Amino acid sequence: QYTPIQHERMEAMIQYSDNRATNYFIELLNRTSRRSGPAEVEHTLKRGNPGVFRHTRIVEYIPRGGRTYRNRASALDYHRFLQALWYDQLPYSEELKRLLHLPNRDRVYTGAREIPRGTWVFDKTGTTARLCGDMGILVARGRDGRRYPYTFIGIIEKARPTRNYALWKNIRGDVIREVSNLTYNHLREMYDLV
């Protein structure tokens, strides 16, 4: 059952990248399994969606300060997840879309000047001292009045933790925005987008 507290924490996890909220849900799964919480998260994802989460590894809770480097997911897994979500092939797809559509400081639309207003965005950002990323579905408008959904996954990694987290996050976020602009311009030509 999806309680009001769980609803609130789910929004905090998705909209604000609240690591305590994330750990709450990992711990919730931990209570229902003989596996550890992280192992149960991975097992649950793969059991329910074996074709989607092929290269995802969940091995740890998110430590204090968010310095987790051992949990992994591939860009292709993110794409498969977003595609399955868009076509309502996941449990609770409508709620997941609602959560990913909540306003946030995304890196695929906000500040990406080439992408017109009115483009729908369903996304999740992620940042550590070694990774800056955003994955999402953008739904562009065509000149024919139709909507054109596409996935965008931007991930920038570095081998060692940055010493200046804010600068790292801001500069890499701007790089992702620029690639999002380039992607939109390419699709604009292909599909006669607004």
Language-model region placement:
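A generic structural signal for nonpolar/aromatic side chains embedded in well-ordered alpha-helices
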Residues: 13, 45, 99-103
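Active-site SXXK
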Residues: 1, 13, 152
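Structured C-terminal helix/loop/strand segments within mature extracytoplasmic catalytic/sensor domains
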Residues: 85-109, 113-120, 125-194
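Mid-domain, small-residue-enriched loop/turn segments at the edges of structured enzyme/sensor domains
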Residues: 5, 10, 16-88
